[in-house]
Structures are given as C-alpha cells and as structure tokens.
Amino acid sequence: MKKQHSKISNFIQKIISEDIQNKKITHVKTRFPPEPNGYLHLGHAKSICLNFDLAQEFKGTCNLRFDDTNPKNEDTCYINSIIQDIKWLEYKWHNKIRYASLYFNKIYQYAIKLIKKGLAYVDQLSPEEIRTFRGTLTTSGIDSPYRTQSIEKNLNLFKKMKQGKMLEGTACLRAKIDMASNCITMRDPVLYRIIFSKHHQTNKKWCIYPTYDFTHCISDALEKITHSLCTLEFQDHRKLYEWILKKIDISCNTHQYEFSRLKLEYSVLSKRKLNLLVNNKVVNGWDDPRMPTLSGLRNRGYTPSSIKLFCKKIGITKQENTIQLSFLESCIRSDLNPIAPRYMAVIHPIKIQICNLSDNYEEILNIPNHPTKPNMGCHKSIFSNTLYIDQNDFYENKSELLKKLAIGKEIRLRYSYVIKAHKIKKDQNNNIKTIFCTYDKNTLGKNPKNRKILGVIHWISEKNVLPARFFLYDKLFTIQSPETVKNFLQYINTNSLVIKYGFVEKDILTNISTTAYQFEREGYFCINKNFSITKNLTFNRIVTLKDKIK
C-alpha cells in the first residue's frame, strides 16, 4: 500500500505509516463515532477531518457509526443533523451508516461471556453508593458486597435485568477488575445499566443498554477498525478498552490513540455549556451564527473548505493548547478572498449632496468584481448628485492625519471622483443629516495636479441603492477562556449581534446565488436565507477584513 503523501505532519500519521511498513496492517480503517445527543461543533470537525483524511491519505476507509447507547438523551434530529454536517464537509463514509445498536445482541453475548468467566457481576448498590465505593484519586476503592456473588446468580440477575424485572437504578452489570487500581476507570466499571426508554433504532426491544466504554471497543473490533482515534480525556479509558477486548477473546487488530481536544478562544465547546446557551436564550438555537456548532458556522457563512483548512492548520498533537480565534478567521478570509465578488455597502449611511451636479445627472461607472481577477467581470454603478457614505468616514473637526472626509477637506470616492466637503446640515437632535460637497470632474481614475488626496472611501448613489439589513456578529464572550470560569454566562458579550440598516448596490441581485461577498472596507458577508430576499434583504457578516482602509 502506497501513501499519497510522503510528508509526515503528525504523530498518528507516523504510527500508521510504521504499521504499514512493518506489515501490522494491510488496510487502514478509521471511524467517526458521534453520540446522537447533540449537534456537532468545531471540536467534532477536528476529529471528522482527522479520521476521514487519514483514511483517504492511506487509501483506506472510514466508517460513520453512531454510538447510540443512551436512548434517554438521543434523538433522530441529532442523527439527521450530524449526517448533514458530514455531507456539508464533503466527506463520504464507507458503505452504509452504522449504529452501535446493531451490535446489541453480540454485545449482550459478550457480557454473558464475561459473567461466565467470573469477570463481571450484577451490582445492586445504588448509583450514589457505587460512586462512594469507587474511591478517589488518593484513596482506593471498596469492594461491593455483591462482588463475590456466584456466576449462576449473576447470570440469573442479568437475565432479570434484560427481562425488565428490575427497576431502573436498582442494578447494573460491572466488570470485575481491580478496586485498588491507580486508574479509577479500572475500578469495576459499569458495563450495563437499566434504562426504560424507547430507542430510536431498536424501539422497546431492550431495557438494558451497554455503556459507552463497553460498546465502543467491541464496535471497533467488529468493524475491524485499525486505528481508533479519540481525544485525551479517554486516555485512561484505553486500559479498559484493551482489557475488554482481551477478556472477550475477540479477534481484532485495533488500537486506541489519543490526541488533544480543540480549545478555541472566546468560545465554549462543552456540550453542556452550549446547551445552557440555548436554554437560557443567550443565542437563537444551536444553529445561531454565533455558535461554534457546524450548523451555526454554516449559517454564519463559513465554507466547508475553510473549516477543513482550519483543522489542517491547527494540526494533531498530544499537547493541550488554545487556538486563537483570529486563526479561524484567517482561514475563512483565505478561502473567500479569491472568489468573493466585491460590492459596496453602506452600513451606517449619511447623505452626501453634490452641489455642482444637477438632480437628473447620472453617470454609469464600471466597477470590477475583483481587483486582481479580470475574468470575474464588472458590474455597473451610478454616480449622481445624491450619494451615501458611511458615518464613520466623516469627521466634523478637520484633521489632516485622518483619512476621512471633513469640512474643507478632499477625499476620493472609490472607483470614482474626488469630492470636497463645504458644509453640513443637522437635525433637531444635532445629528448630521446631510453633507454638502462638490466634486472635481477631472479626477475620475486619476489624482488632481498639485493636490495630495489622503484616503479612499466607499459610497452608493441614491439612484442605485437597495435597502438592506446587516447582522454584525462578534465574539460571544468578553473573556478569552470562558471554558475555565465557573459562571461563564456572566461573561456574555451583549454586543455579539448588532443589527444595522443601510444600503447595498442594486446590482448584487444579479449575483444572488453567490456564496459570499466582500463589501469593500467592511468585511465578508453572505445572505441570511431565513429572510425574504425581496422583502427583507438581510446579510450576515461572516468576518471583518483583516486590514481596513480607513
């Protein structure tokens, strides 16, 4: 088997490469095993990209398997969302979608096998007592009084559990390993528990369900996964993973390897904390564009290739580190910059009146859709006597240092003429209503002689405007590491969404199917498809520009 790339970029690639060279394996098989109890986020994207890309690189296969072992928290809506997200990332899993529940009969038989070998027992301690008996990092655990039950009694009790003759929480099946182990995971972990809930795949066939730890390794073995990849919090579970596979005598060549989980600035990636954001109505659902979920990022305007570029660039290591938000933003900029057509949008409009032009004057200007790609063509704009510029581009007190329009100062309108401000008109609240200017007709595409013009600003003609709403998104938290604080909801950025009403060029309607636009000097935007394009045209700001020309 030949690799597609000779360059080794992470330790897992190196392990796989060595396994192939040493003929430990002949075919690489990975898997992405989400629990269908929530929506995928950026942390999951890291795992998705790792597993699918490794399989592709080494010409192997990657399975999609739902680890559906807890019907209380699972739902088909999560399954559908996960499938949609993986398809959106443009990955294809091997053959059909798999479910751990398809293996429940086999897993049950393996549990019986452990009981018969004296390696599992039915414990009737309460969940609270089990936690207490397990001990701590500094104290050994205590044997359950049910640990020494006969094999026959354990088989009978486990059968009663399966038949629904025991109440939820009154009994569980535990592995008999070592209550004095330094690894708490190995202190007689629970293998099966009673759950009287309808399962989305098996309906009411089962009332006992295997735990994640018991199911996961067996599912990997049954699917002949060669490299089972998970995050570092499962490092201590590897001993149990290997113990189970060894004790049930299953033929397999699968091994678990761990890598660091993703941590991102100004974000939380804990499913519990994301759930709190939704339930406390901090955000408008799991697909809110401020959320780090894949559905949220998709609604924000992030592209599959930008997410995959991000996951590739952050790399795979065992070292825990927090990724800067700017790193993610640079990936979407890199992706959109070559393809996004340029338009002008005025988000904070203020009126400009050109005094030396008549009311009926119109001049058609051809504006390039991309500054470096002539093949992307042009669109038409109108220059007239009434324009709109951004409020932030006018400074009432003249300053030669600021590249802004001011009374007595000149500035260039992008792709157009140089204008000079002479006076302003204010409303009753002392807000500037109109700026009266003149234009220099000899400055189209060239600078005036003997005059230095500082600054270029964007604009739109009143005869070429399309009213629009702009959703300006920002960081959801005011602190860099909200994951590390107890009361993280106290640090919500109340300005994470600011709504503005302004204008965009009419010609944008001819490019309505475009993935994203660059609004010059403002950032990258996409159309918010939750609102009518004809009645309530709304744009989401995906990301600001790295360097604004102000």
Swiss-Prot record:
Keyword Nucleotide-binding: yes
Domain of life: Bacteria
Pfam families: tRNA-synt_1c, tRNA-synt_1c_C, tRNA-synt_1c_C2
Motif ('KMSKS' region): 268-272
Cellular location(s): Cytoplasm
Positions annotated to bind ATP: 35-37, 41-47, 231, 261-262, 269-271
NCBIfam families: glnS, PRK14703.1
Stated name of the protein: Glutamine--tRNA ligase
